[in-house]
Amino acid sequence: MATPSMMPQWAYMHIAGQDASEYLSPGLVQLARATDTYFSMGNKFRNPTVAPTHDVTTDRRQRLMLRFVPVDREDHTYSYKVRYTLAVGDNRVLDMASTFFDIRGVLDRGPSFKPYSGTAYNSLAPKGAPNTSQWIVTAGEERAVTTTTNTFGIASMKGDNITKEGLEIGKDITADNKPIYADKTYQPEPQVGEESWTDTDGTNEKFGGRALKPATKMKPCYGSFARPTNIKGGQAKNRKVKPTEGDVETEEPDIDMEFFDGREARDAFSPEIVLYTENVNLETPDSHVVYKPGTSDDNSHANLGQQAMPNRPNYIGFRDNFVGLMYYNSTGNMGVLAGQASQLNAVVDLQDRNTELSYQLLLDSLGDRTRYFSMWNQAVDSYDPDVRIIENHGIEDELPNYCFPLDGIGPAKTYQGIKSKDNGWEKDDNVSKSNEIAIGNNQAMEINIQANLWRSFLYSNVALYLPDVYKYTPTNITLPANTNTYEYMNGRVVSPSLVDSYINIGARWSLDPMDNVNPFNHHRNAGLRYRSMLLGNGRYVPFHIQVPQKFFAVKNLLLLPGSYTYEWNFRKDVNMVLQSSLGNDLRTDGASISFTSINLYATFFPMAHNTASTLEAMLRNDTNDQSFNDYLSAANMLYPIPANATNIPISIPSRNWAAFRGWSFTRLKTKETPSLGSGFDPYFVYSGSIPYLDGTFYLNHTFKKVSIMFDSSVSWPGNDRLLSPNEFEIKRTVDGEGYNVAQCNMTKDWFLVQMLANYNIGYQGFYIPEGYKDRMYSFFRNFQPMSRQVVDEVNYTDYKAVTLPYQHNNSGFVGYLAPTMRQGEPYPANYPYPLIGTTAVKSVTQKKFLCDRTMWRIPFSSNFMSMGALTDLGQNMLYANSAHALDMTFEVDPMDEPTLLYLLFEVFDVVRVHQPHRGVIEAVYLRTPFSAGNATT
């Protein structure tokens, strides 16, 4: 050990090694400093030792990790409990901050998992194009019933001849020149056809193809899949063959040949086409029918016109930082960290603590949350800003886009050659009789690619995520009654004209119905997509994950020598543990999770024995107790807001408000908030983001006012604010006095309060917070003001309130109120009214704002804008020793579903951990002014 000193040997705890100047020669140090401006040596001469610079003993001391295997495990329906014995030997210190749970198990993401948009099968096929199919038509009366088989499709493979043996595709290279016929088990192959567009020789070729028999139910080609049944790729099922000699029943491919001749042939028939008809295992793994002409699934002429749509993407993965996997703040499901000598549990759960949210905000303060860290599954939930707020600046489509026939010409007529003769013309025998020549411009079709891309983006990303009340079930389609299932959500469609390219054109505006829809439940949630893809792209996953401890009293503890019991519970409720893009009920939709092993990995401080014993001696002293603050340090309370309610009164009984820091609040949907007090919440039928736990708040814009009244006579927070004391007006719909700010309906007063609370900026000039303060969850980064003009329905005399079914725009070029085939005729649009140009109609301006992720904050301190009237002692009345009751009233926008007011009282949430003797650990929890903790001593 180095020279003894009365000072604690903190020097031995250097983890990064010595400073370079301590061990490099003076000349090299001088050179590095002199050349630093144009050539940085950086860490090229970094001391190679890791951790303590000296007094490290054995290689065992330097072991990176130790694995602890559970001494007991309990696998229940909804939870998995593990217990470890942590034996910390003499002259060692266990670093709890280095511990993590190493979990292995099996995950079934269920049939609702779809990790991509579109379809993987025939994605280039038109949505309404059928496979080559057959159907049976029954005609006639009861006495003379006839059934005929009808076929629709294409035969693409050219052959030399057609006989009763099938399509001749070549000749054997022998003296006999035997014909080679297509192997019916896989030929003609659907992917083989004519190699060129040229076919001008006038001969009558023979063609073969494949077709699906009437017993195979029709599906659109888009999304169709049938598994192969032989190694050549053939897909036919097998059929039973009637027993022959020996009564042995055999099987053969269910394939028959059907021959066709031209309709004009009357007698001397000769086959021009042969179709190899078969039954296959037809399925649609990632698409569904969105247009169905009738109720029957049987093959028919009408069902040729079915139209497909891809299933909606639904990424499923573990939550950010494994939110929800470990039990926190749940009665009877918290963990244990107890010394075996005393059996006092250092872990005390409180219903109103915010362990998960606190951890999210802590990470945000430490680093950039947009950088993913796969080990802890750390990929923060996000959304595409272009989806939340649509900047509809139109389409750059000045030039037309054409597509042309493969030959570049189009249909041509056949001409023969002639030549002049005297005063007339005669046939030219030197020129072919069949010359295919087109006249005029070459044929082309125009498609507005930019407009289609923009319209498709709006439908896939915005329209399909509209609230269910705006959607409908397609005719002749039956969906389940449970609206939380993937099948129901996937089957509902919406009219594209609700969110079309001409809606709010030229404006930066979010669709009003979408403002209250969780934007993080979306397939463009990049964090969830990353977490889903970490697990792979299949439904069944054998996973191996590392999960950190988040509980503030345990996660950074230095555990001194002794023997300890450490146990924790892990959830198996898929709705809590997993997250999905659509937020469907994963329990109903067949997801499941099972754990096969949960081990604990831990690291000892890599110190010499004598150094560790010095550290132990220091920490055993009660003046050096370890104290930890919960990062959020707040008591949270949830107050129910009934559907369509606008006022929420809150009363807090009388107490002393010393050391109180202020309020934070936001709004949550009841559906998206689990009951943390119970081990398993049977009513939590949702798997999207959980704002209560992960910080994905999005309803801040629904607050109008908040008033705060203490039972004292003090006007709080003073009279020098723009508006009345004790009341904070958050937004104004009508703003005659000009109190609003930033082209939106937020008041200047509230903007200033947020700048003060988040950045300590109480200045009304141009002052932007420093980058290190303006984090992902902060106010300034997430504040999004917007405005638009709409028709003045009162003062524009010619205004007609034409409802959606009677509006037309792009008629003839789009489907009618449905994402189906285009219909109608080209005609002048009757919607929307022009807001620009010489014929612009009278308009009014609408303003609003969105502010996601953050929580509204109101600070409480004696220097906040002169907090009320000060006494002659310079002490605010509220800080006197007398207790005060608190009344708060929140005014909010009505919502058509029950919600919750999430209110944080910012206090000091502290734990003090004392380890006086070997194997003894004591903890005292202190919370002011909401002292709800209890000591374990």
UniProtKB/Swiss-Prot annotation:
<dbReference type="InterPro" id="IPR037542">
    <property type="entry name" value="ADV_hexon"/>
</dbReference>
<dbReference type="GO" id="GO:0039623">
    <property type="term" value="C:T=25 icosahedral viral capsid"/>
</dbReference>
<dbReference type="GO" id="GO:0005198">
    <property type="term" value="F:structural molecule activity"/>
</dbReference>
<dbReference type="InterPro" id="IPR016112">
    <property type="entry name" value="VP_dsDNA_II"/>
</dbReference>
<comment type="similarity">
    <text>Belongs to the adenoviridae hexon protein family.</text>
</comment>
<feature type="modified residue" description="Phosphotyrosine; by host">
    <location>
        <position position="925"/>
    </location>
</feature>
<comment type="function">
    <text>Major capsid protein that self-associates to form 240 hexon trimers, each in the shape of a hexagon, building most of the pseudo T=25 capsid. Assembled into trimeric units with the help of the chaperone shutoff protein. Transported by pre-protein VI to the nucleus where it associates with other structural proteins to form an empty capsid. Might be involved, through its interaction with host dyneins, in the intracellular microtubule-dependent transport of incoming viral capsid to the nucleus.</text>
</comment>
<keyword id="KW-1048">Host nucleus</keyword>
<dbReference type="GO" id="GO:0046718">
    <property type="term" value="P:symbiont entry into host cell"/>
</dbReference>
<dbReference type="Pfam" id="PF03678">
    <property type="entry name" value="Adeno_hexon_C"/>
</dbReference>
<keyword id="KW-0007">Acetylation</keyword>
<keyword id="KW-0946">Virion</keyword>
<keyword id="KW-0167">Capsid protein</keyword>
<dbReference type="GO" id="GO:0042025">
    <property type="term" value="C:host cell nucleus"/>
</dbReference>
<keyword id="KW-0945">Host-virus interaction</keyword>
<feature type="region of interest" description="Disordered">
    <location>
        <begin position="190"/>
        <end position="210"/>
    </location>
</feature>
<keyword id="KW-0597">Phosphoprotein</keyword>
<dbReference type="InterPro" id="IPR016107">
    <property type="entry name" value="Adenovirus_Pll_hexon_N"/>
</dbReference>
<dbReference type="InterPro" id="IPR016108">
    <property type="entry name" value="Adenovirus_Pll_hexon_C"/>
</dbReference>
<feature type="modified residue" description="N-acetylalanine; by host">
    <location>
        <position position="2"/>
    </location>
</feature>
<dbReference type="InterPro" id="IPR044942">
    <property type="entry name" value="Adenovirus_Pll_hexon_sub2"/>
</dbReference>
<keyword id="KW-0426">Late protein</keyword>
<protein>
    <recommendedName>
        <fullName>Hexon protein</fullName>
    </recommendedName>
</protein>
<feature type="region of interest" description="Disordered">
    <location>
        <begin position="224"/>
        <end position="251"/>
    </location>
</feature>
<keyword id="KW-1148">T=25 icosahedral capsid protein</keyword>
<dbReference type="GO" id="GO:0043657">
    <property type="term" value="C:host cell"/>
</dbReference>
<dbReference type="GO" id="GO:0075521">
    <property type="term" value="P:microtubule-dependent intracellular transport of viral material towards nucleus"/>
</dbReference>
<comment type="subunit">
    <text>Homotrimer. Interacts with the capsid vertex protein; this interaction binds the peripentonal hexons to the neighboring penton base. Interacts with the hexon-linking protein; this interaction tethers the hexons surrounding the penton to those situated in the central plate of the facet. Interacts with the hexon-interlacing protein; this interaction lashes the hexons together. Interacts with host dyneins DYNC1LI1 and DYNC1I2; this interaction might be involved in intracellular microtubule-dependent transport of incoming viral capsid.</text>
</comment>
<keyword id="KW-1176">Cytoplasmic inwards viral transport</keyword>
<keyword id="KW-1177">Microtubular inwards viral transport</keyword>
<dbReference type="Pfam" id="PF01065">
    <property type="entry name" value="Adeno_hexon"/>
</dbReference>
<feature type="site" description="Involved in interaction with pre-protein VI">
    <location>
        <position position="762"/>
    </location>
</feature>
<keyword id="KW-1160">Virus entry into host cell</keyword>
